[in-house]
């Protein structure tokens, strides 16, 4: 069972870091650099996750997915979104075929 509360605690810390001095906090420095820097970090962690998976290195897969989730939470917080927004979307999709879910999306 996932301890969802740990994600909420991390998200709360990330929200606090938005107000912190960028010189004193890695996360604050990412926020200060803006969306492009945060997206670059998410992409980097996604690539590292893929490399660990291709190497079949399960310990590193867990480490890299943790980094990916962390930086995804940074991105969510940057845009004023929350863990609950993502969980709500998971709930909406639960029990729906991936093919059907994709067809239901509106094109913008």
Swiss-Prot record:
Enzyme nomenclature, EC number: 3.6.1.31
Catalytic activity from the UniProt record: 1-(5-phospho-beta-D-ribosyl)-ATP + H2O = 1-(5-phospho-beta-D-ribosyl)-5'-AMP + diphosphate + H(+)
A Gene Ontology biological process term: L-histidine biosynthetic process
Pathway participation: Amino-acid biosynthesis; L-histidine biosynthesis; L-histidine from 5-phospho-alpha-D-ribose 1-diphosphate: step 2/9
Subcellular location: Cytoplasm
Assigned keywords, A-Z: Amino-acid biosynthesis, ATP-binding, Cytoplasm, Histidine biosynthesis, Hydrolase, Nucleotide-binding
Molecular function as annotated in GO: ATP binding; phosphoribosyl-ATP diphosphatase activity
Broad EC category: hydrolase
Positions of transmembrane segments: none
One GO cellular component term: cytoplasm
Major location (coarse): cytoplasm
UniProt xrefs under NCBIfam families: histidine_hisI (TIGR03188), PRK00400.1-3 (NF001611)
Matches recorded under HAMAP family: HisE
Family: Belongs to the PRA-PH family.
Protein's name according to its UniProt entry: Phosphoribosyl-ATP pyrophosphatase
